[in-house]
């Protein structure tokens, strides 16, 4: 415990510049970034009861929720989007609700959703 008390005492005596340099060295040594931890820790102190920022979703799953009346058009669009064969695309469409494509960017997910909805399907992004 005496060693820990000495470390605390040494850290307390650092100047702001020395503390910043220490943080930089520790980030390099441990392969981490203190910026996110500092921002989250400083957020509630500065804003009182402010919540931590919500992380924006970057990967989406396009889910075929319902086929609608134009089953053939939806099958064609699923084939174009996924690259599946006719039978595989038909099986996927008939098994709705079913994921069509997983791990895609928001832009690509929106394009796929628009194309499938234009073909007559009901689509969800998750």
From Swiss-Prot:
Coiled-coil boundaries: none
Domain of life of the source: Bacteria
Biological process terms in GO annotation: translation
Any GO molecular function: mRNA binding
GO cellular component, one term: cytosolic large ribosomal subunit
A Pfam entry, by short name: Ribosomal_L12
InterPro entries recorded: Ribosomal_bL12, Ribosomal_bL12_C, Ribosomal_bL12_C/ClpS-like, Ribosomal_bL12_oligo, Ribosomal_bL12_oligo_N_sf
This protein's UniProt keywords: Ribonucleoprotein, Ribosomal protein
Entry-linked CDD domains: Ribosomal_L7_L12 (cd00387)
Family: Belongs to the bacterial ribosomal protein bL12 family.
Complex and partners: Homodimer. Part of the ribosomal stalk of the 50S ribosomal subunit. Forms a multimeric L10(L12)X complex, where L10 forms an elongated spine to which 2 to 4 L12 dimers bind in a sequential fashion. Binds GTP-bound translation factors.
HAMAP family: Ribosomal_bL12 (MF_00368)
Function field: Forms part of the ribosomal stalk which helps the ribosome interact with GTP-bound translation factors. Is thus essential for accurate translation.
Name used for this protein in its record: Large ribosomal subunit protein bL12
Provenance organism: Beijerinckia indica subsp. indica (strain ATCC 9039 / DSM 1715 / NCIMB 8712)
């Amino acid at each position: 415990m005496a060693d820990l008390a000495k470390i605390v005492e040494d850290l307390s005596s650092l100047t702001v510049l020395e503390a910043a340099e220490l943080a930089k060295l520790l980030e390099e040594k441990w392969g981490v970034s203190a910026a996110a931890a500092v921002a989250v820790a400083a957020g509630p102190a500065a804003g009182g009861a402010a919540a931590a920022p919500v992380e924006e979703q970057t990967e989406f799953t396009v889910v075929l929720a319902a086929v609608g009346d134009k089953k053939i058009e939806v099958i064609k669009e699923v084939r174009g989007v996924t690259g599946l064969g006719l039978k595989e695309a038909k099986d996927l469409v008939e098994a709705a609700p079913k994921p069509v494509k997983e791990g895609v960017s928001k832009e690509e997910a929106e394009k796929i959703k628009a194309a499938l909805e234009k073909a007559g399907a009901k689509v969800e992004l998750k």
